């Protein structure tokens, strides 16, 4: 069937098989047959013609023959088999392949192979205007083997964050991240009024009721997760983080990123935050810091790009080394904006020129802050981009 033609992206097993066949110049041609040709399947079928002894004129070439219309209807279908190729149909395909010639789209009527139209039922309501079908054609094209290859580039864009320690962000820290967030919020709503200061998060006398709610509303949770959810340590840790966030908010005061003013420069905010944490006398471990930052930040396409690190090398904006505020830096990548581009292969042009010219003409005009991820390289030729 047709899946071997396109199944699997660049670098996958299927793609590597196709790549080997084409690079070893083993493929002479592919013939597209009509649908409904076989008993058990009605899907499109393709014949691959392989040879390790190509004629000189076929070297580096692949012939594609469109024979999808070369068939007639059977009087009685056999399962999914409804179409049948006649001797003249088969002869046309074999002769076209044998002659290794290009045939522009030609109607079957011109070729003397027009089939008898299938009789439509006259029962029921008929449309006011008859539907005109496009004439059925036959064609053959010849391509270079390299025309079927491409280099898959990974295109990155910078993470842009706004930050503000709002009351809402602080309140959200009472609950752990997924998968605990929604269950904790639901249990807090149900049982918080019954907890005292020294019994906060204690489910020892409420476990049966809590489990009933979890089973009814959060059936996807595993037993281990339920045990963690009903452990007071989790609740106390989250409350402690929330209280730390309140202290940090107070220390930030009226500065950008505090309660009253949003910061659209996360790089500057990190410096401000570091000072506020020190002044508040609190400490955040790595896990707490991540949850805190996630709670107070939102993606904003108009914010400054987030700097990942300062580089000592020269600027190469096409590959992610940007001049920014007097330094050469690498930005954090925004995974949600990551994209891929398939660049057609061209053996007459070096790989670097090929991908750079493509990037500058097809990508930069649309997203001027993008760059090519140079870490994504082909395993065979070690060039940027994965060949497919």
Where do the model's predicted regions map?
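A conserved structural/catalytic subdomain of Rossmann-like adenosyl-cofactor enzymes
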Residues: 2-388
């Amino acid at each position: 069937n047709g899946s071997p033609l396109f199944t699997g992206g660049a670098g996958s097993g299927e793609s590597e098989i196709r790549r080997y066949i084409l690079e070893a110049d083993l493929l002479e041609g592919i013939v597209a047959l009509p649908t409904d040709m076989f008993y058990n399947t009605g899907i499109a079928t393709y014949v691959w013609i392989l040879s390790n002894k190509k004629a000189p004129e076929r070297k580096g070439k692949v012939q594609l023959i469109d024979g999808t219309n070369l068939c007639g209807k059977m009087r009685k279908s056999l399962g999914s088999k409804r179409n049948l190729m006649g001797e003249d149909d088969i002869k046309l395909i074999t002769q076209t392949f044998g002659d290794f010639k290009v045939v522009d789209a030609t109607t079957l009527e011109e070729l003397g192979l027009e089939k008898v139209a299938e009789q439509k039922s006259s029962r029921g309501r008929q449309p006011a205007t008859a539907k005109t079908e496009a004439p059925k054609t036959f064609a053959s094209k010849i391509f270079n083997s390299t025309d079927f290859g491409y280099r898959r580039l990974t295109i990155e864009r910078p993470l842009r964050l706004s930050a503000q320690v709002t009351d809402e962000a602080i309140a959200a820290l009472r609950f752990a991240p997924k998968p605990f967030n929604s269950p904790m919020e639901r249990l807090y709503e149900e049982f918080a009024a019954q907890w005292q200061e020294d019994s906060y998060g204690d489910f020892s006398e409420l476990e049966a009721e809590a489990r009933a709610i979890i089973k009814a509303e959060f059936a996807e949770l595993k037993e281990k997760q339920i045990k963690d959810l009903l452990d007071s340590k989790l609740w106390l840790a989250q409350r402690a983080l929330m209280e730390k966030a309140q202290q940090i908010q107070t220390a930030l005061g009226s500065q950008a990123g505090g309660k009253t003013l949003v910061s659209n420069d996360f790089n500057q905010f990190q410096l401000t935050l570091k000072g506020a944490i020190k002044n508040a006398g609190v400490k955040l471990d790595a896990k707490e810091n991540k949850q805190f930052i996630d709670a107070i930040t939102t993606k904003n396409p108009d914010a400054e790009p987030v700097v990942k690190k300062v580089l000592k090398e020269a600027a190469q904006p096409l590959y992610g080394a940007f001049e920014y505020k007097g330094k050469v830096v690498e930005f954090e990548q925004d995974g949600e904006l990551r994209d891929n581009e398939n660049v057609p292969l061209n053996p007459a042009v070096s790989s670097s020129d090929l991908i750079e010219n493509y990037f500058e003409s097809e990508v930069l005009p649309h997203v001027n802050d993008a760059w090519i991820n140079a870490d994504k390289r082909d395993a065979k030729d070690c060039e940027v981009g994965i060949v497919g």
